[in-house]
Amino acid sequence: MADYSTKAVWVGGHRGELKCSNGAVVPFSAPAELHGEADVLTPEDAFVGSLNSCFMLMFIWAVERLKIDLESYECEAVGSVQEYLDRTSTFSEITMSPKIVARDCSERDIQRALELAEKYSLIWQSITAEVTLSPEIKILK
C-alpha cells in the first residue's frame, strides 16, 4: 500500500504553502471571493485538477499500452458545487471534456483507452461526486 503525505503551512492571511512528499511546494489560497487571492491555487481547483491530471496520466498510460499514435490531448474539467441550507457544500458533479487527436486507429480504440483511464484513475475511483465524460475524438489518417 502506498502512502502520500502533504503538510499545509499557514503563511498569513488566507494563504498557505502545501509541502508535498515528493518535494514540491505549492502556494495556495482561499478563492478570491472568499477573502483569498487571485492567481493562486485554491483547494477547489486542486480537487478538480487532481481528477483531471490523474485521468490524463492514466489515459496516456492506456494509449501507450494499446499502441495508439496520440497526436494531442487536452481536457477541461468543470466541478459543480451543490450548496445546502446549512451553508455546507459538496462537489456534486465533475464534467470532463477531453479533446483527443490520434492517428491510424479507430474511435473504439480511443474509447477503450478512456475506459481504462477511468478504471485505473485512483482519484476517479476515490471521489463520490458524479463524473461525466464527454470526449471529442478526431482520428487522422
Q: Residue spans of the language-model regions?
A:
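Extended beta-strand/beta-hairpin segments
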Residues: 1-49, 60-141
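Alpha-helical metal-binding/catalytic segments enriched in His/Glu/Asp
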Residues: 54
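Active-site-adjacent loop/helix segments that line or gate small-molecule/cofactor pockets in enzymes
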Residues: 57
